[in-house]
From Swiss-Prot:
Protein name in UniProt: Peptidyl-prolyl cis-trans isomerase E
Matching Pfam families: Pro_isomerase, RRM_1
Catalytic activity field: [protein]-peptidylproline (omega=180) = [protein]-peptidylproline (omega=0)
Family membership noted in the UniProt record: Belongs to the cyclophilin-type PPIase family. PPIase E subfamily.
Domain RRM: start-end pairs: 5-83
Entry note about domains: The RRM domain mediates both interaction with RNA and with KMT2A (via the third PHD-type zinc-finger), but has much higher affinity for the KMT2A PHD-type zinc-finger.
Organism: Mus musculus
A GO molecular-function descriptor: peptidyl-prolyl cis-trans isomerase activity
Modified residues (Phosphoserine): 91, 97
Functional description taken from the UniProt entry: Involved in pre-mRNA splicing as component of the spliceosome. Combines RNA-binding and PPIase activities. Binds mRNA and has a preference for single-stranded RNA molecules with poly-A and poly-U stretches, suggesting it binds to the poly(A)-region in the 3'-UTR of mRNA molecules. Catalyzes the cis-trans isomerization of proline imidic peptide bonds in proteins. Inhibits KMT2A activity; this requires proline isomerase activity.
Matching InterPro entries: Cyclophilin-like_dom_sf, Cyclophilin-type_PPIase_CS, Cyclophilin-type_PPIase_dom, Nucleotide-bd_a/b_plait_sf, PPIE, PPIE_RRM, RBD_domain_sf, RRM_dom
Subunit structure, interactors included: Identified in the spliceosome C complex. Component of the XAB2 complex, a multimeric protein complex composed of XAB2, PRPF19, AQR, ZNF830, ISY1, and PPIE. Identified in a pentameric intron-binding (IB) complex composed of AQR, XAB2, ISY1, ZNF830 and PPIE that is incorporated into the spliceosome as a preassembled complex. The IB complex does not contain PRPF19. Interacts (via RNA-binding domain) with KMT2A (via the third PHD-type zinc-finger).
Keyword Nucleus: yes
One cellular-component annotation, GO: nuclear speck
Amino acid sequence: MATTKRVLYVGGLAEEVDDKVLHAAFIPFGDITDIQIPLDYETEKHRGFAFVEFELAEDAAAAIDNMNESELFGRTIRVNLAKPMRIKEGSSRPVWSDDDWLKKFSGKTLEENKEEEGPEPPKAEAQEGEPTAKKARSNPQVYMDIKIGNKPAGRIQMLLRSDVVPMTAENFRCLCTHEKGFGFKGSSFHRIIPQFMCQGGDFTNHNGTGGKSIYGKKFDDENFILKHTGPGLLSMANSGPNTNGSQFFLTCDKTDWLDGKHVVFGEVTEGLDVLRQIEAQGSKDGKPKQKVMIADCGEYM
């Protein structure tokens, strides 16, 4: 019983998908113990589905929430628990989810991904373009001083888009200033995946399972106006729709498969080189090579 809750059925796969792509797409949710892609021996190609086994049932559940009905290589995939005797592609719960896809390979190969989201890009461009002129005056700027191992790596300066997502921006600003009595100082980037993202913000458990917002609980996705268009964008990590706390990630590349699932609320204005140093400490499974810490943080007044 326990095993079945750890094994996922992944259907609707494109021909290009192999075990490496699936590993990269699902590893952000937890440790993977096995991946099987059944072959059609006549064509010597896979049959369009696979099984992914996680070490923990809760990680498998998070993967379902985040990956079901997401895109991989331009195809919408279905992700649900594998049934013991008969594998059905029955839908689990539709979810836009997040941290997910945190899936770099999924996104990297998904450049045609926008076809399905056709109506959205024009809307995003129009709305993103307008507030830009007022950024400097109305939007707060915060910073993080980063330490890698025992050495200072430099400062990352970020502009928070309170003109677009005021509630999300205010949460992050207060966690940088510690004006509510808690925040990011002394916490670490616990998950770093090169060419994808650097995730931090868990200042309670320091492993991706904790953190809290200034609102005392999880808060809703404010909107998805801003998009994951390139490196240096600041976005909320989550465990499904409307589960924002304090965890965040900085993109290392374009990650447009996260659009509509994670709330983008800021961008790096200085210190992209420091972000690249953080990225260099990452690995395919997300475990940092050495500790990457937020030694100090605050707001520019």
